[in-house]
Amino acid sequence: EERRNKSVNYNEFMKNVEEFVFAESQPEKADIIFVPGNGFPDMAEKAASLYREGYAPYILPSGRYSITLGKFAGVQSKKEIYGGDYETEWEFLKNVLLKNGVPEEAILREDQATFTYENAIFSRQVTDLHKIQVKKAILCCKTYHARRSLMYYQILYPETVIMVCPACPDGITRENWRETETGVEAVTGEI
């Protein structure tokens, strides 16, 4: 009996972790789409698709490179399409957006951030500089990075409704994250 209760508690705990980490919303018309920096094209591809569908007039990719590496880690997937020598995550993400039909004038620039909280901080500086009043925003990030990204952007945009529209570049989803060590490490690393 005690063993069964522990199993139920464990499963309930894992379900709660899942519900917390994997934030997701239906997109609505917004003032901007945010893309926190990374080396995967999928989040920028998702942002470009939402842009082309008319969800927002601007996209703000954000990122210099990871503070832990000290340089741009390089393109992590789809190198045959997006390969190149990029100095920053922003430069890479901008290229992905351009190749996916987003005009240059719709792409704002933030190329100093080295971790997620800085993505939010410096994005706020950019939107303030451009006098963009952000009442609603869409956030395109990794599936399991959704809650942390959302929390940081909410700190900097407390009056803004932020809709999370994640992409899944590495196959880690709400449905399968418990099946691999990589998935478990990625998700539990977010809490």
Question: PLM features: what roles do these ranges have?
Answer:
Residues 1-2:
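Acidic, Ala/Val/Gly-enriched low-complexity intrinsically disordered segments
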Residues 181-191:
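A conserved mid-domain beta-alpha-beta active-site/ligand-binding segment of alpha/beta enzyme cores
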Residues 5-183:
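A structural signal for short, hydrophobic/glycine-enriched beta-strand patches
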